[in-house]
């Protein structure tokens, strides 16, 4: 299958897919960090005599302490030390001290766009937030009168909101406080009435506000402003002045940001330079002018979900914000030290304490919502994670508050954010993925490329023009799949275009731009689905998401039917090794490749072998070149996990039949052939990490040793002399991986032992076995052991003397309960594995590999899978692979059907087998029952489908509990496999048993099997001794409920029903109270206090005796 049939060569090669991460971090190092340091320079003390300047332009970064691989091995952070030249000026005596100061460690991005924090690869997700700028909105009140408002949102600082009301008055709110007349604010800014009215297009509208407020001076306006913003404090003119200055005109407190200034200038047609990041009176006047014009139907209101009003904050900017937080804290410390210390002995090093900055950066990488543990299940998952856009996180939205509008697909998403790929569930629409050709510009807006069109001719020979959503709005843009002739002229009289957020049609000569590619609108994961245009969007969404969950298999196989993007996706994920130069391969083995370059030196490429990924899948690289091969720069020389020949290979091509089989594929279940198990078609390797540390305890150090008490020699035979398992040993659940003993405390010892110790001293010192064992349900082969000790100079957690890590690999064959899926959202669980001889077989005797339910197709509307399976069948018969770019109608109507039909006919002609394609039943063939050899009663669709095995493996989910831990308060068993929990018997299950009247089973479930503490101990005892199970007692949760009601002062008690009896006066005696709290088990709370009334009668001076 070496030759490739490519129908549509990609018209435009994709840009580097991880560039968004790298470019942003590069910007941070080159500009962002310098910008922040300079904004804090100089720092002066309170008297103004001492100044500390940061000479940020010359800052230095030291070589990282560890390489990337070494940092992963040692669980360290891959980072560099930052040094900034500083100058301390003492104005009293004119002394100047220059020094390089260490300001902290900065984690460094690897060339794959990730960070290594404490040995784990992490990704900083891009955040999509509302852009700073001015936004105009209209609202209709209950009388149908329309009012407008404008919000001036800065990057940081106070919000300013202007609004009109039904009486045509103008109001302003500062930071959502009380309303204030706009005239007061403008006067407080020092503008005269004539200046204000001259600047407005409709001064008569503003005049109403002036008349309502009356005439007043700037001083009166400032006092009024102060009263409104600081009610309760004595107002002063200087106070008002200072308040206004600090709120809007102090660059430290108020910052529009470069973007905010750019958006303001664009919206209000101002010419204020980019460097002015604070508000100016000009801005405020222009904003009010625009607001008044809206009342006269001039100008437009803004749509906050439009991508021209939302921008992307990538790593660099998020990190810059965090550095600002750290520098703010640092500035305070430096000021204090300047004041406290002796001025003569001051040096920059003694002033600058790197701790606050280090803490801020650590906090960001370690615990920010946007710093995520990288999804490393397969190369596609890794790539998608780096291109993710999240609306959540600090300064973003929250799941609960986000409405429908924010989540919805917006016309401006076209070519920028994928309309398909988003999670199902509460995050739907809040987390998206960057489209294939999209890029982020310097202001953080997403741009996408278009070819210009001149007089109906697409200029494909010119470089495409990148446009933001704002720039594109007033252009007529045709989609990427419009048909053109060989000269580039658009065919047809009517062309579908997008114009001003609307889908309309126009003539070819009216078109301004054409999209560069049909896959431009979707993300990388979605663009890997062939025949995407035949799938319902909901299923395409599942298909995109499930491709990211495919487990890398032992022998990857690239798809027979692909889309042509597989190679680029594999390349940019960083899993494959690319040659850096032209040259000749001089040496190859499993661990390294050496390439002799044309100009002399030899480059060695080291391969990753069987490394554990973040998701416990296996990372492994294999060479695909031979000695003597000539390689070009950028050529793939080694495959990674889930790639073959430099292309993404997430699953396997297998023979599938769409037919029911004995009900085993009811409700999306899947029936598979034993061949898939025997031939390791769907076998994957998983590597689990187990770790143990020997700590220093109060009673002495823990020891890693082979001398484990009360353990047979058999259990220790795989351990070396230090008590650590040998590499290559096969281990099962319960086996010791590392022997460890912990000193026992005095209290643990019986008296006779204490006596022995008193006589013989330390000799009889006792230890407890605390070894690391293989957990339940796990087994495998030990592939690596790493030992870290203080003596070797390793950095260990506090209190630990030694850390041992053991890596156990297991081969997992496919089995019943595993989840499989195709690329079209067709997912299912394996219900049965059938012997090969029982599987339905084709006329040439070939058994099918997998039987799917045909009812899974019509209602789900993912017909793409049928096209894929039939074209795959043609490809398998012809020995070819196909690349079909989605949206192929540009080559003619019904092109998918035509292509598949033609290829099937060709397959029949080439093979000479008529059954391969039957024109009477196109796409179907006679299939025989493997059990009887009889043909089934009707033809069946059979073909080659590309199926994935997903990471939801039954081995990781199956779980059983006999006895285990209980919750502290309710005493019920915990939940979940990790806690060794039980199965919840919820209210609906209880109803089911009630409906059947199964009283005793129900009673056991609610008492001895759950939280009747005494009863469950007795029941266990009875089972062990073979006696009958005693009567259950009261559940603990009922007692908790009683206690809670008592804590609300409700006197609730349980009484024993008895035969009514009367006292001497003929009154009925109360039923005797049963104290549920008196319990034989030791951990009991004290009994409830009761008041002894007889004691009160005897003595009047006692206030009230309480007996317990």
From Swiss-Prot:
GO terms for biological process: DNA-templated transcription. DNA-dependent RNA polymerase catalyzes the transcription of DNA into RNA using the four ribonucleoside triphosphates as substrates. It is an enzyme of class 2 (transferase). It comes from Thermosynechococcus vestitus (strain NIES-2133 / IAM M-273 / BP-1). In cyanobacteria the RNAP catalytic core is composed of 2 alpha, 1 beta, 1 beta', 1 gamma and 1 omega subunit. When a sigma factor is associated with the core the holoenzyme is formed, which can initiate transcription. It comes from the Bacteria. Belongs to the RNA polymerase beta chain family. The keyword Transferase applies. The keyword Transcription applies. One of its GO terms (cellular component) is DNA-directed RNA polymerase complex. This is DNA-directed RNA polymerase subunit beta. Keywords: DNA-directed RNA polymerase, Nucleotidyltransferase, Transcription, Transferase. One of its GO terms (molecular function) is ribonucleoside binding. Pfam families: RNA_pol_Rpb2_1, RNA_pol_Rpb2_2, RNA_pol_Rpb2_3, RNA_pol_Rpb2_45, RNA_pol_Rpb2_6, RNA_pol_Rpb2_7. Residues 1081-1108 are annotated as: Disordered. It catalyses: RNA(n) + a ribonucleoside 5'-triphosphate = RNA(n+1) + diphosphate. Its EC number is 2.7.7.6.
